[in-house]
Amino acid sequence: MNLFSVPNSLAAAIASFGFAVLPALAAPDRAHVVNVYAWSDYFPPSVVEKFQAETGMHVNYTVFDSPDTAETALSVGSSNYDIVTMNASPHLAREIPKRFWKKLDQSQIPNARNADPQILKILGQVDPGNLYAVPWMWGTVGVIYNAEKAKSILGLLPAESLDLIFKKELAAKFEKCGISVLDSWQDILPLMARYLGQPQLSAEPAQLAAVLKKLEEIRPFLRRISTSGYYEQLADGELCLSIGYSGDAMIARRMAQEGGTKIPVDYAFPRVSVPLYIDSMVIPADSPNYAGALKFINFMMRPEISAEVTRFIGFASGNAAAVPFLDLSMRTNSIIYPPPEVRARFETERVYTSDELRTFNRAWQRFRTGE
């Protein structure tokens, strides 16, 4: 999951609330500092202020622009971070065996019992026994679109929303109003593989070649390949169609209404399968403030706090007890909380070998640069 990077419209808000969007720094009394490494608005200013006021601890908030960046920073050791948000697959799946994270003292985080059972069960596939990670936010990957533009260009939408971008004949119709896809092979390559009827993304030459050929066909029609800022462009009309995250669809919709463009931003789930991402709170193995990190997790898993975050960013909470604290309109919003028939199509990534990772990374770089 994904999601965001600085700069974005919320970075200034974060900075204005008195906690740092800076590299994590040591403090004279480290027991009173919690260094957080996360997406830019996963812990909004309001909830961080409440945590600081209640505990007397100071939060340094460092923003990353991709889980790969975070993984690289953590792999060198001595990161000085206490809390990190990380996606379940593929990152946690390969990091837990490498001892990136510290086991959680469940007695210190009683609010972790509020976790959504379905999400916790899926997370357990990469964290057996749920020993290391507490689910924070989750969502899906799908097609975000300007409903007004789509109707004027096509009339009725295709049954498979991915056709809008993955079929070159349809992508050509939307080229002028702007198409984007996520700059994330972990999201796009498996999605294209399933779209083509493959059971999963494979490095087998013929299967991978088919995936890349189909992507190369639509490459000329893409205005942007990015995981950050695309939701702002959907809100202001610079883009009309994107493969993106469900939470970003909600942000784009809100920005369009609050910003005055009133663009009707909508979201469609893929029919072939629905990619699910789960971002969790984890504690680095070398955290200097393990006790403070546990207090942070327990505080954030309070139902009313988790609900406040969901209201702010529009992502589904991994905290089932938070749902009753949401407005009816948000609880019943199918983009945030998909209905059972969509949940039945949830899929998460498998764990790739080192050779596969290198193959997919190289293939994606060639695609994104148009080589």
Feature locations, PLM:
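A ligand-binding cleft/hinge motif common to bilobed small-molecule-binding domains
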Residues: 90-94, 241-262
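Extracytoplasmic ligand-binding site segments that recognize negatively charged/polar headgroups
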Residues: 87-92, 96-221, 228-235
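Early extracytoplasmic/lumenal segment of secretory-pathway proteins
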Residues: 26-95
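Periplasmic-binding protein-like
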Residues: 208-217, 223, 261-287, 331
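Paired acidic/hydrophobic, glycine-rich loop segments that form the ligand-binding mouth/hinge
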Residues: 81-86, 223-224, 240-245
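Mature extracytoplasmic/periplasmic domains
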Residues: 279, 284-345
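Bacterial N-terminal signal peptides
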Residues: 2, 9-23
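Conserved C-terminal helix/tail region of periplasmic/extracytoplasmic solute-binding proteins
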Residues: 340-371
